[in-house]
């Protein structure tokens, strides 16, 4: 299946540049593009990627891997590929920081299906760094609080039946949109959290005084 290049509306007027593919041989080129965009002309507190996973119908394996930097998203349908992409394995283990919402089950599935684990210090579970009322705040609640109120129904508006179709090729447009938004939200949540932390670094360094205002 040839790669698809699409525009996906994330929220408001924010549009994502999305590449969707199940061809392993095409992934290295897109990864290099993402890495260049990650590495060059980027503030230190923005050097990371958003990561998200979608699972097979039996929930036992990874069907789709999504990576996001800024408004650039790669959707790789692992379940319909030849499952041989050493460049992806190297990329995930290269020391780049990845932000994801709730990786507890994903870590096991990545280990069993890929035979690889992202280094512990390079994988940030956003549910452990940002909390609202509950210990593990949902992606939708975080997105409403930090990005846009439009994300309030980002999970409930996606038909449950579509969750069983992540192995279908090509993916339905609604699945592509859902996958792209998930990856973008993972990236954008962590970006906003890091911007705030970066802006408050002086409070930890020297404390706060009226002269700062």
Which residues does each PLM region occupy?
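A short alpha/beta connector and helix-capping loop motif
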Residues: 57-73
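N-terminal accessory regions of nucleic-acid-interacting proteins
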Residues: 1-49, 81, 126, 184, ...
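Nucleic-acid-processing active sites and adjacent nucleic-acid-binding tracks
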Residues: 72-92, 96
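A short alpha->loop->secondary-structure connector
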Residues: 113-123
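Acidic, Mg2+-coordinating catalytic module of metal-dependent nucleases/exonucleases
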Residues: 144-211
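Short alpha-helix plus adjacent loop in nuclease-associated cores
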Residues: 124-148
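Acidic beta-strand-to-loop metal/phosphate-binding motif
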Residues: 97-103
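Short acidic, Gly/Ser-rich segments with clustered Asp/Glu that frequently serve as metal-coordination loops
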Residues: 48-60
């Amino acid at each position: 299946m040839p790669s698809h290049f699409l525009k996906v509306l994330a929220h408001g007027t924010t549009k994502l540049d999305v590449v969707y593919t199940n061809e392993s041989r095409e992934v290295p080129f897109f990864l290099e593009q993402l890495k260049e965009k990650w590495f060059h002309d980027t503030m230190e507190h923005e050097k990371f990627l958003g990561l998200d996973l979608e699972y097979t119908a039996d929930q036992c394996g990874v069907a789709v891997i999504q990576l996001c930097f800024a408004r650039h998203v790669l959707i790789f349908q692992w379940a319909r590929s030849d499952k041989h992409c050493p460049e992806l394995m190297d990329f995930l283990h290269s020391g780049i920081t990845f932000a994801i919402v709730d990786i507890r089950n994903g870590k096991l599935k990545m280990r069993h299906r890929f035979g690889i684990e992202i280094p512990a210090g390079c994988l940030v579970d956003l549910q452990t760094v940002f909390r609202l009322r509950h210990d593990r705040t949902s992606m939708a609640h975080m997105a409403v609080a930090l990005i846009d109120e439009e994300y309030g129904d980002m999970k409930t508006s996606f038909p449950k039946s579509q969750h069983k179709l992540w192995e279908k090729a090509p993916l339905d447009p609604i699945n592509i949109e859902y996958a792209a938004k998930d990856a973008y939200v993972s990236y954008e949540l962590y970006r906003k959290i890091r911007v705030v932390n970066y802006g408050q670094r002086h409070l930890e360094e020297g404390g706060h005084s009226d002269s700062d205002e």
